[in-house]
Curated annotation (Swiss-Prot):
Taxonomic lineage of the native organism: Eukaryota, Metazoa, Ecdysozoa, Arthropoda, Hexapoda
Biological role: Mediates visceral muscle contractile activity (myotropic activity).
Gene Ontology BP term (one): neuropeptide signaling pathway
Biological source species: Therea petiveriana (Domino cockroach)
InterPro entries on file: Periviscerokinin
Post-translational modification Valine amide, affected residues: V11
Annotated protein name in UniProt: Periviscerokinin-3
Annotated keywords: Amidation, Neuropeptide, Secreted
Length: 11
């Protein structure tokens, strides 16, 4: 679920 959000925050 939050994987997508973490991906963006990990830029």
């Amino acid at each position: 679920g939050s994987s997508g959000l973490i991906s963006m925050t990990r830029v």
